[in-house]
């Protein structure tokens, strides 16, 4: 598709123009990632954001305060919370993320994701062009906190009496349903307002200053976020973008609108004073996503998971909401899959996405992907492929079979190892839980089994190959410790299930891959959340320690001797040129000329009778004359003809100022690039693809365990759910920063002491760029909400990892997988799940499945598909190809 520079005259961005009164034009030039078809989307969202409503329709602060006094939530007074919606839907790879990127650059808006994974995916997309501020989940932005996770939803219900219901009825139903969360947020916001915390008086102060200076009302409001960084994002803009909105239940739409009005009313923001209303931009695919709600029944000790209407389906299908939001004029559909390069396969995916008529040609195409289920379930087949299953039970069964196969095959590269996970249960809290739930006979063992999916990440607790649980009672500590071992496979791909701290300690790859990292600054850009100085200092440390790899490469006996000799001379000459302040001492002359004179680190050649010849093994009479100085002893042990002059002439330090840090990095980078160019010219691919590794200290792998003396000089960062890692093993090396983080968690004192004593191992992962990190353990507290009581029940310790060797179809959504083998369950086929599974790969050459779902009985999302087909024919709906 042709890309163009788009211009829109309504943007507030500034481009200098001497003809305008203030010297700036109000037009904006979008970058090359924007398409011509996205311009109408920008214009329409700006129009919606600029709409003002009459003062009588603006929700009053007193209405929110009245809610705090209600005894029965269904008795709350109905009140409209005005809002607008713009819907952006489309199939996988159609350009929705590019549209979000353009919105972020052209409009002052709040970008969010429905989940942490969605938020991190958006952040990764936005960071490709410019440094992006952190992207939070929509829950974080509207005030959802950890204590709301166990809130009982649907405790109260409201039933309207008129049909069809009004928008006020729909909003009241959602507020009553989500009451426990919203009322807690409301209490907290009013407390902040009463205490003057969180910058609640910032805008009022600016109004007063404007009056004193006789400035127009609102002219200084733009400085509020400079004066107070703790202001909620909702007070900054009324345009809220939610990526992957199809994963959210319908009540979240009202929750976002409710909290936007609440926060702006408390803060008395300019957009509240001017009568602006929130514009919720929902991005996602209504046909491939499901919203699920989980209710835990304490009396039965069972989780009840039910599908619920998601936001996108709610907006599209609900007649009242369609009319209120005028959805036909506020809907953009992206329908071209740019990831897939095969016409037939791409057309098949579009057919499944939009519920178009399925033909025999489509079925015959899918026939070519079918192989026996036994072939897919055999771990010896399809190495490197990701298995997708319908249930967690099937995933766990395959992982057990895979581990058994690897143990029998005794494959050193993909060896199997097990590590312990722990759950610490508070005895007093557990006794109180049994009293409140009326279950005096409930055992800890039964409670652990029933709540494993709530204690840990659900996929992690169900998909892993886990051993039997062993229990230890520590009455003097008021604890029961449950331990179970989880089996992992070395050198396989994994993802983290939550955001974890990691300490980057080194790099392992090739000379070429490390040169690429230095060339495009990808490593530095990816660490925008921390000081760039630390990244440069870390890279300088790695380069300095890894320069010896160039000389180690030249020890290869298969290299041409003449080229090796020339390489030594050119490397030494490069060092002479780049190391400032270095003179041509006898040391350099000996190295450049390839002389066999002995060398010491003070730059003087030794006398002939004490010379050590690097080109042949020393004779006994020469060894007898070796000086006793430790440095000289080291160098006389070398049997190469030239040593690396950098380590003799350059003393590596840790500079303090930014200029010195950057200057040191540029010097190290210049040395690496220069050496790389010399050896790449002489030895070509045999050099560029040769292994290169560098660490902050000496490392050694003993099977699956990494041994390292010191992690000083490592770089603290975050392991994100959107990244893919290779599991290199584990380590018991102490990481002081992780110990400090555990102390800051303020866990139950006895639990913390036991954690210190257990000395839990830490995982060692390698990211897709080659950087090796030690990842902190995943320590989480589990608090149970029973009626009005909150019980600190347990603390869990695991590794926060999930394998990419096998997973459920539901969990694969949003992931790009290169090679996919799918095992469908014939009696539970849903067309949207079929689409999700098949669209994880970009090429049909890497797709296998156990049956042809198009020749089986399946469930189809008929209602939403009909609405989308009607929208494609609607001239008011904006279609982007």
Curated annotation (Swiss-Prot):
Its EC number is 3.6.4.-. Keywords: ATP-binding, DNA replication, Helicase, Host nucleus, Hydrolase, Nucleotide-binding. GO terms for biological process: DNA replication. Disulfide bonds: none annotated. SUPFAM superfamilies: P-loop containing nucleoside triphosphate hydrolases (SSF52540). GO terms for cellular component: host cell nucleus. It is found in: Host nucleus. It comes from the Viruses. InterPro entries: DNA_helicase_dom, HSV_HELI, P-loop_NTPase. ATP binds at residues 90-97. Its main location: host cell. GO terms for molecular function: ATP binding; helicase activity; hydrolase activity. Signal peptide: none annotated. Pfam families: Herpes_Helicase (PF02689). Component of the helicase/primase complex. Unwinds the DNA at the replication forks and generates single-stranded DNA for both leading and lagging strand synthesis. The primase synthesizes short RNA primers on the lagging strand that the polymerase elongates using dNTPs. Possesses helicase-like motifs and therefore may act as the helicase subunit of the complex. Associates with the primase and the primase-associated factor to form the helicase-primase complex. Belongs to the herpesviridae helicase family. This is DNA replication helicase. It comes from Varicella-zoster virus (strain Oka vaccine). The lineage of its organism: Viruses, Duplodnaviria, Heunggongvirae, Peploviricota, Herviviricetes. The gene is HELI.
């Amino acid at each position: 598709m042709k890309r163009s520079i788009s211009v829109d005259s309504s943007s507030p961005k500034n481009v200098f123009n001497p003809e305008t009164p203030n010297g700036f034009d109000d037009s904006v030039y979008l970058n090359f990632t924007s398409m011509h078809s996205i311009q109408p989307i920008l214009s329409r969202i700006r129009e919606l954001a600029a709409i003002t409503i009459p003062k009588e329709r603006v929700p009053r602060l007193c209405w929110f305060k009245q809610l705090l006094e209600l005894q029965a939530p269904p008795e709350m007074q109905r009140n409209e919370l005005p809002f607008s919606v713009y819907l952006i839907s489309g199939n996988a790879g159609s350009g929705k993320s590019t549209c979000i990127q353009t919105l972020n650059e052209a409009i002052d808006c709040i970008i969010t994701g429905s989940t942490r994974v969605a938020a991190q995916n958006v952040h990764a997309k936005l960071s490709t062009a410019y440094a992006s501020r952190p992207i939070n989940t929509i829950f974080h932005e509207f005030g959802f906190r950890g204590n709301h996770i166990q809130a009982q939803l649907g405790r109260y219900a409201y039933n309207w009496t008129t049909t069809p219901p009004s928008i006020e009825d729909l909003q009241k139903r959602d507020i009553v349903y989500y009451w426990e969360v919203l009322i807690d947020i409301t209490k907290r916001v009013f407390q902040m307002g009463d205490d003057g915390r969180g910058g609640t008086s910032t805008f009022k102060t600016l109004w007063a200053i404007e009056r004193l200076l006789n400035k127009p009302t609102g002219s200084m409001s733009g400085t509020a976020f400079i004066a107070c960084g703790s202001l909620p994002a909702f007070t900054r803009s009324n345009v809220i973008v939610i990526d992957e909105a199809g994963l959210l239940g319908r009540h979240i739409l009202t929750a976002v609108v409710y909290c936007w009005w609440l926060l702006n009313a408390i803060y008395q923001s300019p957009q509240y004073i001017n009568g602006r209303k929130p514009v919720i931009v929902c991005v996602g695919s209504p046909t491939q996503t499901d919203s699920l709600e989980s209710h835990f029944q304490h009396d039965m000790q069972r989780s009840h998971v039910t599908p619920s209407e998601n936001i996108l389906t709610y907006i599209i299908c609900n007649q009242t909401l369609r009319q209120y939001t005028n959805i036909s004029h506020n809907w953009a559909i992206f329908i071209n899959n740019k990831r897939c390069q095969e016409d037939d396969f791409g057309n098949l995916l579009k057919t499944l996405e939009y519920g178009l008529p399925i033909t025999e040609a489509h079925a015959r195409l899918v026939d070519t992907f079918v192989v026996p289920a036994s072939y897919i379930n055999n771990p010896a087949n399809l190495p490197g492929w990701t298995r997708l299953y319908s249930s967690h039970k099937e995933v766990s069964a395959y992982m057990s079979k895979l581990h058994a196969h690897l143990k029998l095959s005794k494959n050193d590269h993909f060896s199997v190892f097990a590590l312990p996970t722990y759950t610490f249960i508070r005895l007093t809290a557990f006794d109180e839980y049994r009293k409140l739930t009326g279950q005096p006979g409930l055992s800890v063992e039964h409670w652990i089994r029933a709540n494993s999916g709530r204690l840990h990440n659900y996929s992690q607790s169900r998909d892993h190959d886990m051993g039997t649980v062993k229990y230890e009672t520590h009455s003097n500590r008021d604890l029961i410790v449950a331990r179970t071992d989880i089996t992992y496979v070395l050198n396989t791909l994994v993802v983290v299930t939550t955001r974890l701290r990691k300490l980057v300690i080194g790099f392992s790859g090739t000379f070429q891959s490390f040169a690429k990292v230095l060339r495009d600054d990808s490593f530095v850009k990816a660490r925008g959340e921390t000081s760039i100085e630390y990244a440069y200092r870390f890279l300088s440390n790695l380069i300095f320690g890894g320069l010896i790899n160039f000389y180690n490469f030249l020890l290869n006996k298969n290299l041409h001797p003449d080229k090796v000799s020339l390489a030594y001379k050119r490397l030494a000459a490069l060092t002479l040129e780049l190391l400032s302040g270095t003179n041509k001492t006898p040391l350099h002359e000996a190295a450049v000329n390839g002389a066999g004179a002995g060398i010491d680190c003070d730059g003087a050649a030794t006398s002939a009778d004490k010379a050590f010849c690097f080109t042949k093994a020393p004779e006994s009479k020469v060894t007898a004359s070796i000086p006793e100085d430790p440095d000289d002893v080291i160098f006389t042990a070398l049997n190469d003809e030239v040593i690396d002059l950098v380590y003799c002439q350059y003393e590596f330090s840790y500079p303090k100022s930014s200029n010195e840090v950057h200057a040191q990095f540029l010097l190290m980078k210049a040395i690496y690039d220069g050496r790389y160019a010399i050896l790449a010219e002489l030895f070509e691919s045999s050099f560029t693809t040769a292994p290169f590794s560098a660490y902050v200290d000496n490392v050694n792998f003993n099977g699956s365990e990494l041994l390292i003396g010191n992690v000083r000089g490592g770089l603290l960062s975050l392991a994100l759910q959107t990244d893919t890692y290779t599991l290199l093993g584990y380590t018991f090396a102490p990481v002081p920063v992780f110990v400090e983080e555990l102390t800051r968690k303020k866990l139950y004192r006895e639990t913390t002491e036991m954690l210190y004593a257990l000395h839990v191992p830490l995982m060692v992962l390698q990211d897709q760029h080659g950087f090796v990190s030690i990842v902190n353990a995943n320590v989480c507290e589990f608090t149970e909400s029973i009626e009005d009581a909150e019980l600190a029940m347990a603390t869990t310790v695991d590794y926060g990892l999930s394998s990419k060797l096998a997973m459920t179809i539901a969990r694969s959504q949003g992931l790009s997988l290169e090679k996919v083998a799918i095992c469908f369950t014939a009696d539970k086929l849903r067309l949207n799940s079929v689409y999700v599974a098949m669209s994880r790969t970009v090429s049909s050459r890497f797709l296998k499945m156990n049956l042809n779902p198009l020749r089986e009985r399946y469930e189809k999302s008929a209602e939403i598909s009909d609405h989308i087909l009607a929208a494609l024919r609607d001239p008011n709906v904006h279609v982007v190809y």
